[in-house]
Amino acid sequence: MAIERYFIREAVREMLIDEFLEKELRRAGYGGLDIKKTPLGTKVIIFAANPGYVIGRGGRRIRELTRILEKQFGLENPQIEVEEIKNPYLNAKVQAVRLAQALERGIHFRRAAYAALRAIMNNGARGVEIRLSGKLTGERAKSIRFYQGYLAKVGNPAETLVSKGYAQALLKLGVIGVKVAIMPPGARLPDEIEIIEKPVEEEVVSNEAE
């Protein structure tokens, strides 16, 4: 039971750190993180399209992030490494954040979603699914998904092959949840796939934002 509580606590802490970094590093094209325990402390790998922004002038920003991770989140001797995302269009976290930013700038959700869908597919993705949840068109919250191509939906392939990302857009009507799933180029497709040749949009029956 103690072990279960430990893993739950660590998972919650990683989620909170991820949310913090997403807000702090949006302009860097933040694409997620990986936290690993080492004999010397805690190794934190930050994935970003623009590593220079994460590091900051003279390393100022990365030193500040290190201090916050240690003092605010309780990481033991955090050592931050920054890994460049070679193609941000194939990183679901980056695309979710960018789509959320587009919504916050006032771009209509359908226009923003289809633009993201085309850009991702044009960069070689085998498939993509975008799900927007919240008050998109009026008082009632609903969920709409946009999808195209080949996407593993269940089992181990869905966990290991598909890049997944989540972000939130803060609008006057409320919070819009943005989920993106991308099947990268070259992924070996299993039997459990959904085949959609053309872009499709559908409303998902739901009374609450995801």
Curated annotation (Swiss-Prot):
One annotated GO biological process: translation
Keyword GTP-binding: no
Cross-referenced InterPro entries: KH_dom, KH_dom-like_a/b, KH_dom_type_2, KH_sf_prok-type, Ribosomal_S3_C_sf, Ribosomal_uS3_arc, Ribosomal_uS3_C, Ribosomal_uS3_euk/arc
Record carries keyword Ribonucleoprotein: yes
Keywords: Ribonucleoprotein, Ribosomal protein, RNA-binding, rRNA-binding
Residue ranges of domain KH type-2 in the record: 17-86
Superkingdom per UniProt: Archaea
GO molecular function: rRNA binding; structural constituent of ribosome
PANTHER family in alphabetical order: 30S/40S RIBOSOMAL PROTEIN S3, SMALL RIBOSOMAL SUBUNIT PROTEIN US3
HAMAP family from the UniProt entry: Ribosomal_uS3_A
Full protein name: Small ribosomal subunit protein uS3
Organism: Pyrococcus furiosus (strain ATCC 43587 / DSM 3638 / JCM 8422 / Vc1)
Lineage start: Archaea, Methanobacteriati, Methanobacteriota, Thermococci, Thermococcales
Gene of this entry: rps3
